[in-house]
From Swiss-Prot:
This is Succinate-semialdehyde dehydrogenase (acetylating). It catalyses: succinate semialdehyde + NADP(+) + CoA = succinyl-CoA + NADPH + H(+). It comes from Metallosphaera sedula (strain ATCC 51363 / DSM 5348 / JCM 9185 / NBRC 15509 / TH2). GO terms for molecular function: oxidoreductase activity; zinc ion binding. Zn(2+) 2 binds at residues 89, 92, 95, 103. Signal peptide: none annotated. Its cofactor is Zn(2+). NADP(+) binds at residues 189-194, 218, 279-281, 355. InterPro entries: ADH-like_C, ADH-like_N, ADH_Zn_CS, GroES-like_sf, NAD(P)-bd_dom_sf, PKS_ER. Its EC number is 1.2.1.76. It comes from the Archaea. Binds 2 Zn(2+) ions per subunit. Keywords: Metal-binding, NADP, Oxidoreductase, Zinc. Zn(2+) 1 binds at residues 38, 59, 165.
Length: 360
């Protein structure tokens, strides 16, 4: 099959033929329909998330079940599915406790580029090729069955592909924030996750929703999707602006940028006694200093949120799509053939895309 393979960090991806094995126990082979391109993939390409190459990335996958391994019961060949970027084992303590987004088994292998048994299902010329959270930049992908959710026949598979990360992470952020109807919320970062969060906040009954970013066209999109106010942090002091808009700061700040400046912005702008939810992922080795005294004296609650629960939250997201209360296609700014993936990567790196779909 064809796949976009990274051989060297910071070098273009290579489109080449690779071998894919049969799915093992609990695994599912998918014929890929579309895969969203996310900044987390770019972090792999740049070596900021150091998954060992050669590696095939791509973790917002939609497609058709081609084959199932022994013991698979949740899906069958022919099913239309989306894959979450989190692949829960379903058996560890966290999975059993309902926190499958924090699966202990998955956490041990997600940055190694292998399946839970320590091996990959891709190879070429007898050498293993690793995958990042599914390896969807290819014609086929193999993932654990617990990552998959069936998609109704009347729903466009391309439209829902980005639910696997952008949608699921936005949903998880709101669940962690425990917002009440009418609460004021600031969302820092208006990429795929931030814009998903804004749509889902509107669906959840949030009051004032403030979008913070640096690109006017993305802030305009945020207003279209449910933001009540926007702050361009390149043009004005964002912390001062957020506090002025909210009369002292929002009850909740959701940080979706994943860098030092935006994390500090979130901590500095939240209301005394408020909550900061961190969902943006910095590079895996990043260390960010914070003023702990301000957090303690302000009674600020800081919560880290990693994605959402595939088996619990993904069906709820699909229902919101069906009801017309969440439209993931509004995040998609481009559609590229697999052979054009390097062009899509460049656009995302330059801030000229939100989500691009890669079509094998």
């Amino acid at each position: 099959m064809k796949a976009a393979v990274l051989h060297t960090y910071k070098e273009p991806l290579s489109i080449e033929d690779v071998n894919i094995s049969q799915p093992k126990a609990g695994e599912v082979k998918i014929k890929v329909k579309a895969t969203g391109l996310c900044h987390s993939d770019v972090n792999v390409f740049e070596g900021k998330t150091p998954v060992p190459p050669p590696v095939v990335a791509g973790h917002e996958i939609s497609g058709i079940v081609e084959e199932v391994g022994p013991g698979v019961t949740r899906v069958k060949p022919g099913d239309r599915v989306i894959s979450a970027f989190i692949h829960p084992c379903g058996k560890c303590g966290n999975c059993v406790a309902g926190k499958e987004n924090l699966c202990e088994t998955f956490s041990q292998v997600r940055l190694k580029g292998v399946m839970p048994d320590g091996t990959s299902r891709l190879s070429k010329d007898g050498k293993e090729i690793r995958t990042f959270l599914g390896g969807g930049f290819a014609e086929y992908a193999i993932v654990g069955e617990n990552a998959l959710t069936r998609v109704p026949e009347d729903m466009d598979l391309e439209k829902v592909a980005v639910l696997g990360c952008a949608g699921l992470t936005g949903y998880g952020a709101i669940s962690s924030s425990k917002i009440e109807p009418g609460d004021t919320v600031a969302v820092i970062g208006v990429g795929g996750v931030g814009l998903s969060t804004i749509q889902l906040l509107r669906a959840s009954g949030a009051g004032r929703i403030i979008a913070v970013g640096t690109k006017k066209w993305k802030l305009d999109r945020a207003m279209e999707l449910g933001a009540t106010d926007v702050v361009n942090s390149k043009e004005i002091d964002p912390v001062k602006a957020i506090k002025e808009i909210t009369g002292g700061g929002p009850q909740v700040v959701i940080e979706a940028g994943g860098n030092e400046d935006t994390i500090h912005m979130a901590l500095d702008s939240v209301r005394i006694g408020g909550k900061v939810v961190l969902v943006g992922l910095p590079p895996a080795t990043a260390m960010i200093p914070i003023r702990v005294a301000s957090i303690v004296r302000g009674g600020i609650e800081v919560v880290g949120n990693y994605g959402g629960r595939p088996r619990v939250d993904m069906p709820k997201l699909l229902e919101l799509v069906r009801q017309g209360r969440y439209d993931p296609s509004r995040l998609v700014t481009g559609r590229f053939r697999l052979e054009e993936i390097n062009e899509a990567v460049k656009m995302l790196e330059e801030g000229e895309a939100i989500r691009s779909l890669i079509i094998p």
